[in-house]
């Protein structure tokens, strides 16, 4: 047909390869090719190393085929090799089968893998018939167990002596062409089956790691085919992740962190330059001390640190650290500028810088909880600000870093003046004359609060003290309410747990109850008994019974 020029070179190469294969593969040794074939295929071993690379039916049918199917495949394949040794009877009668098989295999390979399986026509035109033969046979040398291995050797030795007819050779040629045509599809099946069975098999027996070893040693065209097969299946969702994760694209994953490390180093340099020019306070060193990351401040140590670790999730934390710093840094800078102007208005600017540093450090460490603030010292110093202005400035700084100035001052001052004025009323006249020396609105408000709160609390305490004392006519709602009910409980106002009240408490009533409840219960019991007896007497009297006998029983 149209491919006559390829026939002779194809037949010569194929016959040389089959002769070498039948003489050398009996003892499971590596195939050594002649020089012309070595120039086309620079491979060292097909039977042992490339056995795992075979695209064919062996690994696809591991789970489903019994041992008899292994024998059938082996019979057809060993007829390939055995029949081709007889070169006298080996002749193509119409000389169309290898060329058409070659063209059909190229077309079907292109259809099977899309536009990406271009590795077969990229090499010389005689390469496809030679590659699948040893790959098919080598795939049978590496099953999971040694039993298939020995059966394959024995059956090849027996079947090599059988028929050498050209008809069988032609059918085996067509079978070799069909095996070559099924090459990319079988590769996809092998990859999927490997990912399915990877939990059951050990890694040295599985196909793809041995493929990586053969790629790294001496194979030139097979990585191109593998890469094209991987590109052909990019449409599916799970297969690119499986291919990229382990065993095909492992070499470009190693130098990948270097550009990201350089970009991070550039980001760190930009961030350090921005923070060095913008921030006026020493807040960024304290923040770095809090976060304990000294290597992030050094831009030269960034690429070496990332290249040693080679862990991609570790790269995501240092930008977050810098983002946290940039998120926190505007707030102390604005507050520092605002309080710088505030301190220049009130006091001398000499203690301004250490006060801001201490306030910044406290703000970063405590998260705005105002733990360092002492309310008693703050109230005493603010009540006479003419003598100690810098301490009031410090306390105002600590207040205004987290909340607005006026509302918490009123709250804190009210509570502190309550605690000072109530337990020790003798201090209030000593504080108030000093506060009159400086007419400020804050001190005036505090004095007003102290004047309102100070007489109120001792009055309530006097009321509570009078309640424990002897009864007086001012206090009498409790005693007046109990006095008309029971005659016994008139003098008792409240149960005090003393030695004198022991008999009152422990007379059938719970110790926590008062004598009022005891008297009320006794009165209710007496009334109930009286009503019951009266009703019984009336019923007996209506019935015409003996009323006197019933009264004697009831009384």
Swiss-Prot record:
Residues 162-171, 259-281, 293-310, 419-431, 464-488 have a biased composition (Polar residues). Disruption phenotype: Prevents the formation of normal conidiophores. Induction: Expression is induced during conidiation, after conidia had begun to form. Positively regulated by abaA. Negatively regulated by velC. GO terms for biological process: asexual spore wall assembly; conidium formation; pigment biosynthetic process; positive regulation of conidium formation; positive regulation of transcription by RNA polymerase II; regulation of transcription by RNA polymerase II. Keywords: Activator, Conidiation, Sporulation, Transcription, Transcription regulation. It comes from the Eukaryota. The keyword Transcription applies. Residues 113-171, 250-310, 419-488, 508-531 are annotated as: Disordered. The keyword Translocase does not apply. BrlA, abaA and wetA are pivotal regulators of conidiophore development and conidium maturation. They act individually and together to regulate their own expression and that of numerous other sporulation-specific genes. Responsible for activating a set of genes whose products make up the final two conidial wall layers or direct their assembly and, through this activity, is responsible for acquisition of spore dormancy. Has an acidic N-terminus (AA 1-52) followed by a Ser-, Thr-, Pro-rich domain (AA 125-233) and a basic C-terminus (AA 461-555). Belongs to the wetA family. This is Developmental regulatory protein wetA. The gene is wetA.
């Amino acid at each position: 047909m149209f491919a006559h020029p390829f026939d002779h070179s194809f037949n010569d190469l194929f016959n040389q390869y089959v002769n070498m294969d039948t003489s050398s593969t009996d003892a499971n040794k590596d195939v050594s090719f002649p020089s012309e074939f070595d120039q086309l295929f620079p491979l060292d071993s097909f039977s042992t190393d490339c056995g795992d690379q075979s695209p064919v039916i062996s690994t696809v049918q591991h789970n489903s085929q019994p041992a008899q199917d292994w024998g059938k495949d082996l019979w057809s394949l060993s007829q390939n090799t055995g029949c081709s040794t007889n070169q006298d009877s080996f002749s193509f009668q119409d000389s169309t089968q290898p060329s058409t098989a070659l063209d059909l295999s190229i077309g079907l390979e292109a259809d099977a893998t899309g536009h990406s399986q271009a590795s077969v026509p990229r090499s010389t035109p005689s390469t496809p018939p030679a590659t699948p033969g040893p790959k098919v046979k080598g795939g049978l040398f590496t099953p999971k167990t040694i039993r298939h291995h020995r059966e394959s050797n024995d059956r090849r030795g027996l079947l090599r002596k059988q028929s050498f007819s050209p008809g069988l050779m032609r059918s085996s040629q067509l079978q070799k062409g069909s095996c070559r045509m099924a090459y990319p599809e079988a590769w996809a099946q092998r990859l999927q089956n490997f990912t399915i069975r990877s939990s059951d098999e050990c890694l040295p027996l599985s196909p793809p790691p041995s493929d990586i070893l053969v790629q790294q040693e001496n194979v030139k065209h097979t990585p191109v085919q593998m890469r094209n097969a991987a590109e052909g299946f990019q449409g599916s969702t799970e297969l690119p992740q499986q291919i990229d994760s382990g065993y095909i694209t492992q070499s470009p994953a190693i130098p990948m962190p270097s550009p990201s490390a350089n970009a991070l180093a550039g980001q760190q340099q930009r961030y350090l330059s921005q923070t060095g020019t913008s921030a006026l306070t020493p807040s960024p060193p304290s923040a770095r001390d809090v976060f304990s990351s000294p290597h992030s401040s050094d831009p030269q140590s960034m690429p070496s640190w990332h290249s040693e670790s080679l862990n991609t999730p570790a790269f995501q934390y240092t930008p977050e650290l810098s983002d946290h710093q940039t998120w926190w840094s505007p707030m102390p800078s604005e507050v520092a500028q605002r309080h710088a102007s505030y301190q220049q208005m009130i006091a001398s600017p000499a203690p301004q810088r250490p006060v801001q540093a201490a306030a910044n450090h406290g703000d970063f460490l405590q998260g705005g909880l105002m733990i360092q603030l002492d309310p008693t010292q703050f109230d005493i110093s603010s009540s006479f600000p003419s003598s100690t202005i810098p301490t009031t400035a410090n306390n105002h700084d600590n207040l205004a870093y987290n909340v607005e100035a006026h509302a918490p001052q009123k709250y804190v001052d009210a509570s502190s003046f309550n605690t000072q004025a109530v337990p020790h009323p003798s201090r209030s006249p000593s504080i108030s004359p000093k506060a009159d020396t400086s007419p400020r609105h804050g001190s005036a408000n505090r004095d007003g609060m102290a004047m309102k709160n100070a007489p109120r609390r001792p009055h309530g305490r006097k009321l509570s003290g009078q309640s424990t004392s002897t009864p007086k006519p001012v206090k009498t709602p409790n005693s007046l309410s109990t006095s008309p009910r029971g005659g016994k409980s008139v003098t008792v106002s409240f149960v005090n747990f003393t030695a004198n009240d022991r008999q009152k408490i422990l007379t059938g009533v719970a110790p926590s109850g008062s004598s009022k409840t005891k008297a009320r219960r006794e009165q209710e019991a007496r009334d109930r008994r009286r009503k019951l007896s009266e009703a019984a007497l009336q019923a007996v009297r209506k019935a015409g019974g003996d009323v006197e006998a019933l009264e004697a029983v009831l009384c």
